[in-house]
Amino acid sequence: MDELFKAIILGIIQGITEFLPISSTAHLVITPWIFGWSGIVNSLSFDIAVHVGTLISLLYCFWKDWINIFFRERKMLLFIIIGTIPAGIAGIAFHDLIESALRHPLIIVVTLILVGFLMLYAEKVGKKLIRSITLSDAVVIGTAQAIALIPGVSRSGITITAGLFKGLDRAYAAKFSFLLSTPAIAGAAMLDFYKSIKIGHSHDYSLFIIGVISAAITGIIAIKFLLSFLQKYPLNLFIYYRWFLAVVIFLLYFFRN
């Protein structure tokens, strides 16, 4: 199959699933596995592209917030820095493990189900208050973001869940989750770029551009949709989807093996 077509499809999947609480890694691992795709799946050009694309989505949707954070809300900037540290440490320390052993389909099945139950419980017990982020919130949600490095967990899913457990309003927890993910995604893009330089990887710029555009456009749509959705509805729709996806992956794995 044409590599450009794969880039478009996987870029769209990345843009949508990076920001919805359904795990982008699960979808990017499972989609090529289902269709038997190779090539672009292991391309550093594409890895960098989707990170850049989703970063563009975040900056487009929250550039006004970032201006306020840098020039007026310095405390929020400090909280974002503190919240980014756990994921940074975990990403460097466990990178090889995450990229190899933890990408097994059955591990993704387990994490999809377990985090779904966590999301459901958080919806029931969370107080959902509209209040300012505290240092404690930043530490807890930042630690949750580190856990999201495990495939199937979902960065937005686990961080919004952590915010709900801390008593934050659903939509506000999602917004802080997105702000917190910005430096993490930027860091991932820079790490991949560094790896590409280190190994002398030659970039396929057509795949890069297609990946950036498809991930950025769908990412913007996904962010705006989720923030609007969570102002009115609970996380149940995404919880049920996670469980459905887990069953599909398990059945496919069972019948293929």
UniProtKB/Swiss-Prot annotation:
GO terms for biological process: cell wall organization; peptidoglycan biosynthetic process; peptidoglycan metabolic process; regulation of cell shape; response to antibiotic. The chain crosses the membrane at residues 4-24, 51-71, 78-98, 106-126, 133-153, 171-191, 207-227, 235-255. Keywords: Antibiotic resistance, Cell inner membrane, Cell membrane, Cell shape, Cell wall biogenesis/degradation, Hydrolase, Membrane, Peptidoglycan synthesis, Transmembrane, Transmembrane helix. GO terms for molecular function: undecaprenyl-diphosphatase activity. It is found in: Cell inner membrane. InterPro entries: UppP. GO terms for cellular component: plasma membrane. The keyword Ribonucleoprotein does not apply. It is a multi-pass membrane protein. The keyword Ion transport does not apply. Its main location: membrane. It catalyses: di-trans,octa-cis-undecaprenyl diphosphate + H2O = di-trans,octa-cis-undecaprenyl phosphate + phosphate + H(+). Its EC number is 3.6.1.27. Belongs to the UppP family. HAMAP family: Undec_diphosphatase. Bacitracin is thought to be involved in the inhibition of peptidoglycan synthesis by sequestering undecaprenyl diphosphate, thereby reducing the pool of lipid carrier available. Catalyzes the dephosphorylation of undecaprenyl diphosphate (UPP). Confers resistance to bacitracin. This is Undecaprenyl-diphosphatase. The gene is uppP.
